[in-house]
From Swiss-Prot:
Gene3D superfamilies: 3.40.1370.10. Residues 49-79 are annotated as: Disordered. The lineage of its organism: Bacteria, Bacillati, Bacillota, Clostridia, Eubacteriales. It comes from the Bacteria. GO terms for biological process: translation. One of the primary rRNA binding proteins, this protein initially binds near the 5'-end of the 23S rRNA. It is important during the early stages of 50S assembly. It makes multiple contacts with different domains of the 23S rRNA in the assembled 50S subunit and ribosome. Belongs to the universal ribosomal protein uL4 family. This is Large ribosomal subunit protein uL4. GO terms for molecular function: rRNA binding; structural constituent of ribosome. Keywords: Ribonucleoprotein, Ribosomal protein, RNA-binding, rRNA-binding. HAMAP family: Ribosomal_uL4_B (MF_01328_B). GO terms for cellular component: ribonucleoprotein complex; ribosome.
Length: 207
């Protein structure tokens, strides 16, 4: 089982923690992680784009000019796709961009992303994050002591309002509960800062 250092909120190492090998110690599968990110980004697309076709555009019921004798090209409607203000041929219509991905493959992608963070040394486990009231300065100080200088995903066991409200004001820091972690967020942040209880929750849910 992989072991990583366990830190307190002062940035000092207070021990080590063993991680579940089936979640944090597998060989990262880049292809599956890529597939998971593409699937997730596709699911976020609203797909509400819409243009009007010949049957939907208003007006154009009257023939612009007579069929013959004007010297101009024949025209049956002023809403032809060839005309300015006319309909659109084969334009975008509302659709769902969701891509199906088997549950086992999604789990493999998540485990690969977590294992990749462990391998690269970008997983930081904290014994606890406890605050009496929301205070951005406190969370910023903790991250600074942990030497987190870039984008970080802050994972707690459950939704902790004090931690979430404190962390969401810091640029590049995204708080999330353990059951809500996903491949895109893990890969999109340089560091993964996770509490000891959140590690147990992840291992319980995704093992």
């Amino acid at each position: 089982m992989p072991k990583v250092a366990l830190y307190n909120t002062e940035g000092a190492q207070v021990g080590e923690i063993e991680l579940n090998d089936a979640i944090f110690g597998i060989e990262p599968n880049e292809a599956v992680m890529h597939q998971a990110v593409v699937t997730q980004l596709a699911a976020w697309r609203r797909g509400t784009h819409k243009v009007k076709s010949r049957g939907e555009v208003s007006g154009g019921g009257k023939k612009p000019w007579r069929q013959k004798g004007t010297g101009r090209a024949r025209a049956g409607t002023s809403r032809s796709p060839l005309w300015r203000g006319g309909a659109i041929i084969f334009g975008p219509q509302p659709r769902s961009y969701k891509i199906a991905m088997p549950k086992k493959v999604r789990r493999l992608a998540l485990k690969s992303a977590l294992s990749d963070k462990v391998r690269s040394g970008n997983l930081i486990v904290v014994d606890a994050l406890e605050m009496d009231a929301p205070k951005t300065k406190v969370i910023a100080g903790i991250l600074n002591k942990l030497k987190v200088e870039r984008k970080a995903l802050l994972v707690t066991a459950d939704i902790d309002e004090t931690v979430f409200k404190s962390a969401r004001n810091i640029p590049g820091v995204s708080p999330v509960e353990a059951v809500g972690i996903n491949v895109y967020d893990i890969l999109n942040h340089d560091k993964l800062v996770i509490t000891k209880n959140a590690v147990a929750k992840v291992e319980e849910v995704f093992a």
